[in-house]
């Protein structure tokens, strides 16, 4: 059965995360927040904090003194043991009145006081620091198992304690209004005023505990508030994870803007004890307050420090962004400069190449004396142009960067030379004055020549570049040329023959011919072109070449066989024609004999008829011979053409003989 307690009983109170702490059951003041049912208002010695706990977490002091009354490392625990024995009626005392300006004043150093000072103000802080450390450590060591089971109960205990402390403060504030000189609005809103008057000063625990929020001097005794975590509290936080905060009310955030951040030595917030403060010998530890929600209770000073940190971070980010922008701008500038330099170098190289080409052409083209004179004239012009920069206009081919480089390179060499050559120049100054004019006249002539030659070379190069297209393009061009050359209206045989020759020289593959079947079709058609035999022969040659290249030596063998067969056929046809001509000749002779007998002509007439018959035979033989080569190859055609005039010659001799015979017969008749 849990023990029944009365106000004023001394007990050991157990709160999760802390050892059994020396405490006292408090009275419920009029107007104060009533504790929940089955819970007692507890006042913790050493820390002077309050909470609401059930009877199961309370143990009588006298019975459990030997068990739980051992010293502990927790700060505030040993002070609580001393206080429960020597000053069991210790309570919060009203601190002196605090104005709005006092909130800005630095807090008294908690380590400056001693236990001998019994003032109400000094006693509070001392008790807070001492009891907090010792009691918390003892409780943590002894009841770590019970801590795990009572997670939710701790939260419930802290909320009623919060309410009770608020009520106590309200009562104290109402009793001490005259002393504190606080406005009635502050009395009514005790909770808000206590929150607004909390400080941001934090003391760091050298041991495992987080810093405690120190109390501010104010009309209402505030409770210790949990500090907002700072960078320096990382160690204390890490340690306090295992050990829960001491039995204290839940921390509250500073809601009013009237509270200003204090500029104490430590830039961290400290919890506020409820009723009084006492300078502690040790730095204030984080007492019994739990840390369920550290984000909620940032005080005005912590918010200021956070804002300062945010400002620093924002300034750092701005600086980084500015640096990045500067670096990017520099990189862009460097890239642009590099591109410009590369372009300038390319231009210079192009100009140098042009100049070299022009000079080489000029040296090649300029012959004998004229070239020598121009060179002799150019050398002094260059020298003078280097010495006097603005006198002679530079040629169009000279590039500016080259001139600058030459000038800079030869300045140093000319300075010592100028002193030695000045006396030698004086007598021949007139000649030099006359020479520049001649040089200027000769220079444009040379420039024009070089320009013309460069234009000619450029045209030739362009033509060469244009003539370098692929085989397919050449095929298509030649095909179009052949078509245009063999127009019905105005055929151009020479152009067609040239195109066919080029087509025959092309190295054509089967793939190209498969793509361009029109070319093969046109060649087949041109083989039958009757208007000109040369075109026919050339087309046949090109066609056979293409075939031989594409299909290989097999077709050549087949073609040879075909040619041999054709030649045999032609020979047989010739023999048949000759036999027919031989048979026709005796028939004609037989016919001529009866005709002579019947007609009985004169000698001259008979001879003339014989001559005509002979001529007819010869003409028939000539026709037969002409028909033969037509059916034959192109070589036979050439032979027949050559033999044509030879066939006419015997005919003409016979005509002359017949004329001579006719003349002789006429003379005989006259005689």
From Swiss-Prot:
**Placement of covalent cross-link Glycyl lysine isopeptide (Lys-Gly) (interchain with G-Cter in SUMO2):** 554
| Record field: compositional bias (Basic residues) | 155-172
Write out the GO MF terms: histone H3K27me3 reader activity; histone H3K9me2/3 reader activity; histone reader activity
Please describe the quaternary structure of this protein: Interacts with HDGF. Interacts with trimethylated 'Lys-36' of histone H3 (H3K36me3). Interacts with trimethylated 'Lys-79' of histone H3 (H3K79me3), but has higher affinity for H3K36me3. Interacts with IWS1. Interacts with H2AX, POGZ, RBBP8 and CBX1. Interacts with histones H3K9me3, H3K27me3 and H3K36me2. Interacts with DPF3a (isoform 2 of DPF3/BAF45C). Interacts with SMARCA4/BRG1/BAF190A, SMARCC1/BAF155 and SMARCD1/BAF60A in a DPF3a-dependent manner.
Q: Indicate where the modification Phosphoserine is found in the sequence.
A: 114, 137, 165, 230, 232, 234, 240, 266, 305, 366, 369-370, 395-397, 399, 454, 458, 490, 625, 633-634, 640, 652, 664
Keyword annotations for this protein?
Coiled coil, Cytoplasm, DNA damage, DNA recombination, DNA repair, Isopeptide bond, Myogenesis, Nucleus, Phosphoprotein, Ubl conjugation
PWWP domain: residues covered: 7-64
Biased-composition ranges, Basic and acidic residues, are 138-150, 195-210, 234-244, 310-364, 423-473, 565-577, 586-595, 612-664
What species is given as this protein's source? Homo sapiens
What is known to happen upon mutating residue 21 to A?
Loss of interaction with histone H3K36me2
Expression by tissue, per the entry, reads: Widely expressed. High expression is found in heart, skeletal muscle, ovary and testis. Overexpression is frequently observed in hepatocellular carcinoma samples.
This entry carries the following GO cellular component terms, namely: cytoplasm; nucleus
Coiled-coil-forming residues are 521-581
User: Where is this protein chiefly located?
Assistant: nucleus
- Annotated PANTHER family: HEPATOMA-DERIVED GROWTH FACTOR-RELATED (PTHR12550), HEPATOMA-DERIVED GROWTH FACTOR-RELATED PROTEIN 2 (PTHR12550:SF18)
Described function: Acts as an epigenetic regulator of myogenesis in cooperation with DPF3a (isoform 2 of DPF3/BAF45C). Associates with the BAF complex via its interaction with DPF3a and HDGFL2-DPF3a activate myogenic genes by increasing chromatin accessibility through recruitment of SMARCA4/BRG1/BAF190A (ATPase subunit of the BAF complex) to myogenic gene promoters. Promotes the repair of DNA double-strand breaks (DSBs) through the homologous recombination pathway by facilitating the recruitment of the DNA endonuclease RBBP8 to the DSBs.
**Record-given protein name:** Hepatoma-derived growth factor-related protein 2
Quick one: where's region Disordered?
Answer: 86-473, 562-671
Q: Which Gene3D superfamilies match?
A: 2.30.30.140, Conserved domain common to transcription factors TFIIS, elongin A, CRSP70 (1.20.930.10)
